[in-house]
């Protein structure tokens, strides 16, 4: 996403803990990288003013990772959300885009899921994502546009490949072991 935005001519500030390394993105005249924790409200108050849009991707990003440390997951995925939205709105942000998850739908019998369906999150990870959606919508106003996306499993080529996602796990097994290991059997992936 960062490289695409830069290619389109946007100025981009990346705010990240950098737990996977600090030299992931190439240097670019329109790219500013700030190492920081989404829970640090004072740092957010310094960084956010002067920007037009926040694309909020910072979270513990799946159920297994979340379950390793539920209190950490809650502090990052839920507790830090309202302060981030309030700081963004008061800091002059015009557009706030939130990356939720398709897991907020829970398990549906219907083949096609749409935004009008009742949310039935099954885990704390997806429940907190649904809670954040509700919080964000309360802040929507004429001068603070909010947008929520609910991506399914995101996979594909990346400079920092994630091997905790099922599609990438299967690809890794196929390439390195010349076999595909099937796990479970009852899961449905959007």
Regions found by a protein language model. Give the residues of each.
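Conserved catalytic-core motifs of eukaryotic protein kinase domains, centered on the activation segment
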Residues: 24-26, 64-71, 107-111, 159-160
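NAD(P)H-binding glycine-rich loop region in Rossmannoid oxidoreductase-like domains
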Residues: 38-76
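Conserved sequence/active-site signature of Rossmann-fold short-chain dehydrogenase/reductase
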Residues: 39, 104-105, 154-156
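N-terminal Rossmann/SDR dinucleotide-binding element
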Residues: 1-53
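Conserved active-site helix of classical SDR/Rossmann-fold NAD(P)-dependent CH-OH oxidoreductases
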Residues: 3, 81-82, 126, 130-137, ...
């Amino acid at each position: 996403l960062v490289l695409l935005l830069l290619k389109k001519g946007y100025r981009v500030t990346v705010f990240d803990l950098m737990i996977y390394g600090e030299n992931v993105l190439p240097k670019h005249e329109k790219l500013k990288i700030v190492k920081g924790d989404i829970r640090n409200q004072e740092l957010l108050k310094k960084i956010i003013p002067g920007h037009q849009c926040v694309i909020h991707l910072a979270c513990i990003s799946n159920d297994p990772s979340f379950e390793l440390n539920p209190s950490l997951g809650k502090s990052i995925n839920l507790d830090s959300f309202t302060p981030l939205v309030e700081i963004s709105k008061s800091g002059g942000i015009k557009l706030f885009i939130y990356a939720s998850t398709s897991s907020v739908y829970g398990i549906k019998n219907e083949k096609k899921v749409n935004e009008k369906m009742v949310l039935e999150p099954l885990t704390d990870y997806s429940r907190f994502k649904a809670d954040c959606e509700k919080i964000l919508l309360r802040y929507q106003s004429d001068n603070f546009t909010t947008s929520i996306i609910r991506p399914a499993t995101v996979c594909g080529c990346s400079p920092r490949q994630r091997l905790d996602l099922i599609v990438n796990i299967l690809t890794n097994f196929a390439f390195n072991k010349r076999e595909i290991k099937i796990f479970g059997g009852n899961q449905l992936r959007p």
